[in-house]
């Protein structure tokens, strides 16, 4: 199967092609038709599986097919809720890349930064909004964002969102949207609290599970170190200098700590 077989319009296919994509991933193949059919979806998919495109492409397709030029950007019709600013920014960039030929307007709002520039963007009109829970509710409380016309609500990284204590915020956001909306919930894991949330807010959801049978590829050795937070940098330096050889890929939770680690490694000439 190729993207052209998923009933996506020529504008979206052109953008996908320019990014060099031809064959959809498993989560995309399973999720896109369901979302195009306006089904609620609960998907178990880890980062790196292509899940952002799995919900971005059908949202863009659906809004493009129904768009009225006279109402462009006048109402927020799709909302993606993400737990962190870094993820929210990445998602908005993906929407802009995939929707560059659709004329649909996107915006991202998140906390930890000035609210006025975000308000200005919202006032200019938005079709698709990507937001972190706290900032979204702040904007709604000040009557600066209207969720009354949402057609599709996406909850991304739901397990992380609940781990960060956003359960009440997520439920409130869901209630602020129309009852008739489509909901798609994506989560890397499916603990009881995520399943319980899905049972509460989703309507007869279709299930998508692309969790690998074996989480670690063959030939990969796993080692776990229990280390205090204050000793993480020290351990990292020790491993880089004495244990790990060849090319190295390091993951950290946020952009801030990645930048901090990168500066430290440069200082140590590693």
Give residue ranges: language-model regions.
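Conserved helicase RecA-like core
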Residues: 2-270
């Amino acid at each position: 199967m190729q993207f052209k077989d998923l009933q996506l319009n020529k504008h979206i296919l052109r953008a996908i092609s320019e990014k060099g994509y031809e064959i959809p991933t498993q989560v995309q193949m399973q999720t896109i038709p369901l979302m195009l059919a306006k089904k609620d979806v609960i998907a178990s998919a880890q980062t790196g599986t292509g899940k952002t495109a799995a919900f971005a492409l059908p949202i863009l397709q659906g809004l493009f097919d129904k768009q009225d030029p006279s109402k462009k950007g006048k109402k927020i019709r799709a909302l993606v809720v993400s737990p962190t600013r870094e993820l929210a920014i990445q998602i908005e960039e993906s929407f802009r890349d995939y929707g560059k030929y659709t004329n649909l307007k996107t915006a991202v709002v998140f906390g930890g930064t000035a609210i006025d520039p975000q308000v200005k963007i919202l006032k200019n009109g938005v079709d698709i909004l990507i937001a972190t829970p706290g900032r979204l509710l702040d904007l709604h409380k000040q009557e600066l964002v209207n969720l009354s016309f949402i057609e599709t609500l996406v909850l991304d990284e739901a397990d992380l969102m609940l781990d960060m204590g956003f359960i009440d915020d997520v439920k409130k956001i869901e209630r602020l949207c129309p009852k008739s909306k489509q909901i798609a919930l994506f989560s890397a894991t499916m603990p009881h609290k995520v399943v319980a949330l899905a049972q509460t807010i989703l309507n007869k959801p279709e299930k998508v599970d692309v969790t690998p049978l074996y989480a670690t590829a063959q030939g990969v050795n796993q080692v776990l170190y229990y280390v205090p937070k204050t000793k993480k940098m020290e351990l990292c330096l020790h491993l880089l200098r004495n244990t790990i050889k060849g090319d190295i890929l390091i993951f950290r939770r946020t952009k801030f700590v990645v930048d901090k680690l990168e500066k430290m490694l440069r200082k140590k000439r590693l």
